[in-house]
Amino acid sequence: MALRCINNLEIFLRRCTAPTLHRCCVASSRTAHTASSSKGSGGDNSKDKENNGQNKSGYRSFGWRSAFQFCVPFSLGALVSAVLIERHRDELTPTISARSLKGRRNEFNFIADVVAGCGDSVVYIEIKDTRHFDYFSGQPITASNGSGFVIEQNGLILTNAHVVINKPHTMVQVRLSDGRTFPATIEDVDQTSDLATLRIQVSGLPVMKLGKSSTLRSGEWVVALGSPLALSNTVTAGVISATQRASQELGLRNRDINYLQTDAAITFGNSGGPLVNLDGEAIGVNSMKVTAGISFAIPIDYVKVFLERAAERRKKGSAHKTGYPVKRYMGITMLTLTPDILFELKSRSQNMPNNLMHGVLVWKVIVGSPAHSGGLQPGDIVTHINKKEIKNSSDVYDALAEGRKDLEIVILRGVKQMHVKITPEDP
């Protein structure tokens, strides 16, 4: 292409310059001829000199014309071709790079596609304390919060039981993804599976599709949606670490559930939100976090059984609450420290005592609760209550059931041992 441009430009310049050079040569020869005629016939020496002069002039004219006709077109052609090639290269390079990056972005943005398809069905749940009011707005303050997702267009919402129950003197509010807020009523509760449903009076809501947890594989990509720390519409992603994590391994002796373990971040406020696969289907309900990279969700297959039983109860008009009776209220969410969990905690933190063999980890404290007023903090480890050793969460429930007014609790906060006193509330 470049060679063709050079040849074409050379031919063009030759055609343009040849007539001018020819006229110059003709004029020069006519001048020389006139001068020789005016002198007449001179001597032989004068003629020889004149002839020698004409030969030299013709030689000089022929050399200059040949050099000009060859060098100028070639130089100009090469220069123009080089400029055109460089400009053409500059124009092509960014275009190729932009197309390549755009294609890769669309190819690997699968998580964004999942969120766009199902994010509108996720809701933010607030628990309002009706005894305490904000000084400026006059509205009840938020005692705790959680997440949920719409499973029926007529306002049925699924969440965790611990998000909405065992909280006396409170009311439940639900905020949709479009910003609208509605009061909610608790329809069904099963504390055994830690599941509950809420109802708001609105219709035409976007619904979350329910998938199958039985087909999950370890290493499969999942996305956790919810409102951690009251930050609505938060998205985290990870993989399934284990599909059959037995409740006994987590110290939950009253439950017969094989939890989904994931490294997707599930923090305070994510509880009750959906854990979805790359098809945008809920395959679990976010339940609890032990530490960074270790979180658990209730498999959706257990959720379907709960929903079927709840629908049957509603048809029969029976009581909507099932499971264990409501206990005295302390205001914490806890997890038994099994050997596996202890090993993980000790490997991730240098502040864990080496001689710690058992206890209960406090991983959430509800603001305004007796535990919060007594000084408990997330991350504390309960080792004794009323001078009795605590080995699992059942021991804590037993201490609450004893009916004593105050609980004398021994905790580990880092490497320090501390004593706190809590007065639980009656239901």
Curated annotation (Swiss-Prot):
Short motif IAP-binding, span: 78-81
Subcellular location per the Swiss-Prot or TrEMBL entry: Mitochondrion intermembrane space; Mitochondrion membrane
Protein topology in the membrane: Single-pass membrane protein
GO biological-process terms attached to the record: apoptotic process; positive regulation of apoptotic process; proteolysis
Keyword annotations: Apoptosis, Hydrolase, Membrane, Mitochondrion, Protease, Serine protease, Transit peptide, Transmembrane, Transmembrane helix, Zymogen
Pfam families found in the cross-reference section: PDZ_6 (PF17820), Trypsin_2 (PF13365)
Disordered: annotated span: 33-55
Broadest EC class assigned to this enzyme: hydrolase
Main localization (coarse): mitochondrion
Protein name per its UniProtKB record: Serine protease HTRA2, mitochondrial
Source species: Drosophila pseudoobscura pseudoobscura
Gene it is expressed from: HtrA2
